[in-house]
Amino acid sequence: MGVKRVIVFDTTLRDGEQTPGVNFNSRDKLEIAYQLAKLGVDVIEAGFPAASNGDFEAVKNIADYVKGVTIAAMGRAVKEDIDRASSALKNAEKSRLHVFIATSDIHLQYKLKMTRDEVLKKAVEMVKYARGKFDEIEFSAEDASRTDWDFLVKVFSEVIDAGAHIINVPDTVGYAMPREYGELIRYIRNNVPNIDGVTISAHCHNDLGLAVANSLSAIENGATQVEVTVNGIGERAGNAAMEEVIMALNTRKDYFGLVHGINTKEIYNTSKLVSELTGIKLQPNKAIVGANAFRHQSGIHQHGVINNRLTYEIMRPEDIGVVPDTFALGKLSGRNAFELKVRQLGYNLSPGEISEAFRKFKDLADRKKTIVEEDIRFVVEETIEEFRGFREGEAWA
């Protein structure tokens, strides 16, 4: 039996656009879609065609021009949404409808005003209606993590019989715990009688900061598709961050034993593009793509990394397309890191000069919140002037 592969479904352009303050225009969406295809995602959820004319045109443009990847469009379980999605995806190389209806009792009572039987009937009818209009049909049970498990199994079983190829299990409000969500995925796999050959998808929100953990738990328990967004953008607290899920799978291949189609060297470029087009800056300590993700300030850590990067790095910045800027020099930095930085700047100092320059650096670092490259050059040039009687002005060869 071959190595199992996880399908990467990117919803940056649909769920990601639901981030408060984010509004992609059609050109933005197309640019991101091209980059997602270059990144190697399997499915791009391009938008919600029935939501607006602008979203319809954006989805249509992506379907018309972006090839080599499945293009998905979302719609409610109503004929008008399904028809609109079908029209938008007409020229897609491979099309997918992502149709949804809520299944939790709280949604049925307060939002849909429907009974369980009515929801089940509507779900089955709309999947049957969509059959033949798309290459694939994905059915989502909205608020699955708060739905009665046996009812969820019944819904999934009947929509599969109706023609669904993928069943999605959304933790819509980020309520589930990792073990609990994994157990739900396993329960579905073990109790839906016609599940063989059907893709089980995980879609997790980050309201409790657990979207990535829940996604990985789902994969561990049998989910074969994971739904993610670049930089974790999305409704409220966001979605599972693509870069974190993928690099967890990469870094712990020994644990998960799975492969995917992502070209990880495009992760940083993709993250940067989405950050620029959304206007959402990444926090410096953001995992994988934050400015500090591969930087070390402690002298002990810096010394370890100089000797062998594996001492304090579990992945290489080059693996995600980042040019290393390994050391953040500051008051906690040690002499080894300082000396390496001085050499990288092109200076060739004697041991005595290094000692004096390092003393000046530590004194400055105690007084200055942020040390930049020009600060290093200043203390080195000042030291050279004191020892040699002149400022070098340029790096020594």
UniProtKB/Swiss-Prot annotation:
Enzyme class label: transferase
Main location: cytoplasm
PANTHER family: 2-ISOPROPYLMALATE SYNTHASE 1, CHLOROPLASTIC-RELATED (PTHR10277:SF9), HOMOCITRATE SYNTHASE-RELATED (PTHR10277)
GO MF term (any one): 2-isopropylmalate synthase activity
Family statement: Belongs to the alpha-IPM synthase/homocitrate synthase family. LeuA type 1 subfamily.
Domain Pyruvate carboxyltransferase: start-end pairs: 6-268
Summary of the function given for this chain in its UniProt record: Catalyzes the condensation of the acetyl group of acetyl-CoA with 3-methyl-2-oxobutanoate (2-ketoisovalerate) to form 3-carboxy-3-hydroxy-4-methylpentanoate (2-isopropylmalate).
Catalysed reaction, written as an equation: 3-methyl-2-oxobutanoate + acetyl-CoA + H2O = (2S)-2-isopropylmalate + CoA + H(+)
Any single GO CC term annotated in Swiss-Prot or TrEMBL for this entry: cytoplasm
Compartments in which it is found: Cytoplasm
Pathway membership: Amino-acid biosynthesis; L-leucine biosynthesis; L-leucine from 3-methyl-2-oxobutanoate: step 1/4
Protein name, entry field: 2-isopropylmalate synthase 1
Native species: Caldanaerobacter subterraneus subsp. tengcongensis (strain DSM 15242 / JCM 11007 / NBRC 100824 / MB4)
Coiled-coil spans in chain: none
NCBIfam families named among the record's database cross-references: PRK00915.1-3
Top-level taxon of origin: Bacteria
Binding positions for Mn(2+) per the UniProt entry: 15, 203, 205, 239
GO BP: L-leucine biosynthetic process
Subunit composition and interactions: Homodimer.
EC number: 2.3.3.13
Cofactor names: Mn(2+)
Keywords of the record: Amino-acid biosynthesis, Branched-chain amino acid biosynthesis, Cytoplasm, Leucine biosynthesis, Manganese, Metal-binding, Transferase
